[in-house]
């Protein structure tokens, strides 16, 4: 949910899905509302400059590490390259709040497949520790996720489709997680992805990727769990058509191996 970039705007043919639709990277917030200022401060925006527009999302998972999608770090010709992250900010750009930290390295998941978006995960290492608390990671066995559990996706993307403008303030929308079999049957994804959404008019959509999909446990932001990162979908806000997210639990072993180095 942020500014549309050439990386995020790329349209990719979806041969595995039996629908006539664009396989597009996400996201945008349809049918949601503003996140209260000063909350969900583990949410991260990727930027090319400290004050520039956010073009991809992520989540702080340790004081010095951000989890995002590998598609956000792809150094393709004409694409935006992240050099900075904005942590804890409510706004699309600027230095009004939060903190701006330099990225010193980016490591994509070893099994990342750019054609299918399997294992679409990347860990960014920061130059210095963030002052904000990181979000909790899910259990490796996937037990934090089950069919129809409510989740929340957040970001700065456009709030109307197809001609909307990016939101200057952090937005969120609540979506339900699909069961694995239903997700695979609908969109042909593997176990490194999960589906959420499918309620008409409420979705993440065309734009940047990497925005966090979280589960709230009713005990405040410190107890939120990172379930996924916004990836791709077919259409926007269509009934019975979910969006696809990178499943964080599928990469836990790899994530831990990177952040503990």
Curated annotation (Swiss-Prot):
InterPro entries: Peptidase_S1, Peptidase_S1_PA, Peptidase_S1_PA_chymotrypsin, Peptidase_S1A, Trypsin_dom. It is found in: Secreted. Secreted effector that suppresses host plant glucan elicitor-mediated defense responses. Targets host endoglucanases and inhibits the endoglucanase-mediated release of elicitor-active glucan oligosaccharides from P.sojae cell walls. One of its GO terms (biological process) is proteolysis. The keyword Ion transport does not apply. This is Glucanase inhibitor protein 3. Residues 1-21 form the signal peptide. Disulfide bonds join 56-72, 183-195, 205-236. PANTHER family: FI18310P1-RELATED (PTHR24276:SF98), POLYSERASE-RELATED (PTHR24276). One of its GO terms (molecular function) is serine-type endopeptidase activity. Belongs to the peptidase S1 family. Pfam families: Trypsin. Glycans are attached at residue 108. It comes from the Eukaryota. Keywords: Disulfide bond, Glycoprotein, Secreted, Signal, Virulence. The gene is GIP3. GO terms for cellular component: extracellular region. It comes from Phytophthora sojae (strain P6497). Residues 29-260 form the Peptidase S1 domain. The keyword Signal applies.
């Amino acid at each position: 949910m942020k500014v549309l970039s050439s990386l995020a705007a790329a349209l990719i043919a979806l041969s595995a899905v039996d629908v006539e639709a664009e396989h597009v990277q996400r996201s945008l917030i349809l049918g949601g509302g503003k996140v209260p200022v000063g909350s969900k401060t583990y949410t991260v925006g990727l930027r090319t400059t400290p004050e520039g527009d956010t073009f991809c999302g992520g989540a702080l998972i340790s004081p010095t590490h951000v989890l995002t999608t590998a598609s956000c770090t792809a150094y393709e010709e004409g694409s935006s390259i992240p050099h900075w992250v904005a942590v804890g900010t409510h706004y699309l750009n600027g230095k009004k709040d939060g903190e701006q930290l330099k990225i010193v390295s980016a490591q994509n998941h070893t099994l990342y497949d750019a054609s299918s978006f399997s294992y679409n995960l990347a860990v960014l290492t920061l130059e210095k520790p963030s002052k904000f608390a990181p979000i909790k990671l899910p259990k490796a066995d996937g037990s934090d996720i089950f069919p129809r559990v409510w989740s929340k996706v957040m970001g700065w993307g456009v709030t109307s489709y197809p001609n909307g403008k990016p939101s200057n303030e952090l937005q969120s929308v609540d979506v339900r997680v699909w069961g694995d079999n239903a997700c695979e049957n609908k969109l042909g994804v593997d176990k490194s992805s999960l589906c959420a959404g499918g309620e008409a008019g409420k979705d993440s959509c065309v734009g940047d990727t990497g925005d966090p999909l979280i589960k709230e446990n009713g005990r405040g932001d410190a107890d939120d769990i990172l379930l996924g990162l916004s990836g791709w979908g077919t259409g926007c806000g269509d009934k019975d058509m979910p969006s696809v997210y990178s499943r964080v639990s599928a990469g836990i072993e790899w994530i831990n191996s990177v952040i503990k180095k």
